[in-house]
């Protein structure tokens, strides 16, 4: 997920709003002071294995095959002791200089556009929680404000607090390269490309990157009930925070968090080649069939019940009875992705509610009151 600072979430509240805290079960007595920037995580004595993606020789921190056999030990466990999430440790005027570890293409050749998985080394100095965002300041001068640095762009973090290396020293971003094509000529106009996304996707290992944050509370994964149900709805790179949730639930061995509930992911993309982290998610489906469900809406390959393109709201309608029953039982529902996805989803939910003899306005109000409704769109 990416957005300009100040235009991050446009539905219920800004990303940092809502006062949505976190309480974790079985927390230790020691507390990490997130306000102290000198805190550095303990080095993890565990070497990760390589995973080749279905599209190219892409290296991740461990293999899906290993994850299927046993969960991965993570360190430092003190990252789970804090009672409140870290917030705005680094601000735009004083960003933290991190280092690019790797940049890998996530999508196949038939995907419209390019999406990259970018691992950043912050040395344990910019800790975060699942569901938060980093700000990135691309190098150069703001074209609209000569003499000023470029505007901060916010990206949802696509890893757990322990990072893809499981040592608390890295964070991963899921970034779609923003390009502009002239509607008349059909040719790409490099002068109008996304400054930050292209900087990140063009980065090389060892390059420096200025980051701010972490920011955001509304998409934090509530952990007070380890048996809760979480319904996650995403389009494209909106899947980023959910990857962090799911790795925490199913991949990592965190003594203070043992997930026993249901995680249900709905992902909408153009086609099969556009699927993001599909191999990871499919592995969870195979290994935890009682705790994970995974439904895809491929708009260029699938048809909805009316013969039109299959969008994520069509999948929601298909399973609407189950979804509403789960919400009535206290399930959390999350939306992350393009701002344009929300009107169609809201219309679908309203129509389904009316068919059930319910008022969607009242139901939505109750979901927000109960802190079951989480939205981050851009």
UniProtKB/Swiss-Prot annotation:
Domain FAD-binding FR-type: 93-221
EC primary class: oxidoreductase
Protein name per UniProt: Ferredoxin--NADP reductase, embryo isozyme, chloroplastic
Binding site for FAD: 153-156, 174-176, 180, 195-197, 237
UniProt-recorded Gene Ontology molecular function terms: ferredoxin-NADP+ reductase activity
SUPFAM superfamilies: Ferredoxin reductase-like, C-terminal NADP-linked domain, Riboflavin synthase domain-like
Gene3D superfamilies: Nucleotide-binding domain of ferredoxin-NADP reductase (FNR) module, Translation factors
Compartments in which it is found: Plastid, Chloroplast
Cofactor requirements of the protein: FAD
Matches recorded under Pfam families: NAD_binding_1
GO cellular-component term (any): organelle membrane
The enzyme's E.C. designation: 1.18.1.2
Organism: Oryza sativa subsp. japonica (Rice)
Keywords: Chloroplast, Electron transport, FAD, Flavoprotein, NADP, Oxidoreductase, Photosynthesis, Plastid, Transit peptide, Transport
């Amino acid at each position: 997920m990416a957005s300009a600072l100040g235009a991050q979430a446009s539905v219920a509240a800004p990303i940092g709003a809502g006062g949505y805290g976190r309480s974790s079960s079985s927390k230790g007595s020691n507390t990490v002071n997130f306000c102290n920037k000198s805190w550095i995580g303990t080095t993890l004595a565990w070497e990760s294995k390589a995973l080749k993606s279905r599209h190219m020789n892409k290296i991740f921190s461990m293999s899906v095959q290993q994850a299927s056999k046993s969960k991965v030990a993570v360190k430092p466990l003190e990252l789970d002791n804090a009672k409140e999430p870290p917030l705005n440790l680094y601000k735009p005027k004083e960003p933290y200089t991190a280092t690019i570890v790797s940049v890998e293409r996530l999508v196949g050749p038939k995907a419209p556009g390019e999406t990259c998985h970018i691992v950043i080394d912050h040395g344990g100095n910019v800790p975060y929680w699942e569901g938060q965002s980093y700000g990135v300041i691309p190098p150069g001068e703001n074209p609209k404000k000569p003499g000023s640095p470029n505007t901060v762009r916010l990206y949802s973090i696509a890893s757990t607090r322990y990072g893809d290396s499981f040592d608390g020293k890295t964070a991963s971003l899921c970034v779609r390269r923003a390009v502009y094509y002239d509607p008349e000529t059909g040719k790409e106009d490099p002068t109008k490309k996304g400054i930050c996304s292209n900087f990140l996707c063009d980065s090389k290992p060892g390059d420096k990157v200025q980051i701010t944050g972490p920011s955001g509370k509304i998409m934090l994964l509530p952990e007070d009930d380890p048996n809760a149900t979480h319904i996650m709805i995403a389009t494209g790179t909106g899947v980023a925070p959910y990857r962090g949730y799911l790795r925490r639930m199913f991949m990592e061995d965190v003594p203070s968090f043992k997930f026993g509930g249901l995680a249900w992911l709905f992902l909408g993309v153009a086609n099969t080649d556009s699927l993001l982290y599909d191999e990871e998610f499919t592995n969870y489906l195979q290994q935890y069939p009682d705790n994970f469900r995974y439904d895809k809406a491929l708009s260029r390959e699938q048809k909805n019940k009316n013969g039109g393109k299959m969008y994520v709201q069509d999948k929601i309608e298909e399973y609407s009875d189950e979804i509403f029953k789960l919400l009535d039982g206290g399930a959390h529902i999350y939306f992350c992705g393009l701002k344009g996805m929300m009107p169609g989803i809201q219309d679908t939910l309203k129509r389904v509610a009316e068919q059930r003899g319910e008022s969607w306005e009242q139901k939505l109000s109750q979901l927000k009151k109960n802190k079951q409704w989480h939205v981050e769109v851009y």
